[in-house]
């Protein structure tokens, strides 16, 4: 949900003012923690082995780490030092890495995107207009503005800079509530090959029975 925005803002405060290697390490640690907690189901899916769980978490964490270094480098650009500039650069770089890991290597691993938990929030209404890319970008954009609104280490030229950042972040969250959701029925049809619902627990016992899951 929307708690992701302040969480990402806090994370951003750790990487946008440090060197590339430190940002890499910070995001690698963050990424490993995130993915190990997100995909423990891979242990059961691979027969109870921890190695695939750890390996997949590490590979995905590398993408986070690369983004950390990229963010650190982009913050050295003069036009990225403003609140709007940083928000734009950070949103584009994060979504770019997010889409990269969703398609690479092989067919990618499109889990853990910032857009997914926003389905029941006002930002979820942006999905029909730009898909997960737009939703993730707006989440990051809001997070940067929130981070800048509480960044007292910078000497802003105007007293209203921080309040304006905060108000803008709030507005970006609230405004999508005014967007209509199309309730009309779509034309055409789609064929679904298979639908897999929940399985009986314990999972390994269910998997061991041939045809019970896929039959």
Annotate each language-model stretch with its function.
Residues 179-215:
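Soluble catalytic regions of membrane-associated enzymes that act on cell-envelope
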């Amino acid at each position: 949900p929307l708690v992701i925005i302040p969480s990402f803002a806090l994370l951003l405060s750790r990487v946008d003012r440090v060197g590339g290697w430190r940002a890499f390490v910070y995001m690698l640690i963050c990424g490993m923690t995130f993915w190990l907690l997100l995909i423990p189901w891979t242990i059961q899916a691979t027969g109870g082995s921890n190695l695939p769980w750890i390996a997949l978490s590490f590979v995905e964490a590398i993408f986070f780490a690369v983004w950390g270094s990229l963010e650190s480098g982009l913050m050295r650009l003069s036009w990225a030092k403003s609140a709007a500039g940083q928000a734009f650069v950070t949103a584009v770089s994060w979504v770019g890495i997010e889409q990269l890991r969703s398609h690479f290597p092989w067919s990618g691993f499109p889990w853990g995107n910032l857009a997914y938990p926003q389905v029941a929030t006002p930002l979820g209404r942006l999905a029909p207009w730009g898909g997960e890319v737009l939703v993730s970008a707006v989440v990051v954009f809001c997070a940067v503005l929130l981070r800048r609104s509480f960044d007292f280490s910078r000497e802003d030229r105007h007293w209203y800079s921080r309040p304006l950042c905060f108000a803008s972040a709030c507005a970006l969250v609230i405004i999508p509530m005014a967007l209509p959701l199309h309730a009309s029925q779509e034309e055409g049809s789609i064929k679904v090959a298979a639908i897999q619902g929940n399985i009986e627990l314990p999972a390994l016992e269910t998997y061991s029975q041939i045809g019970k899951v896929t039959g």
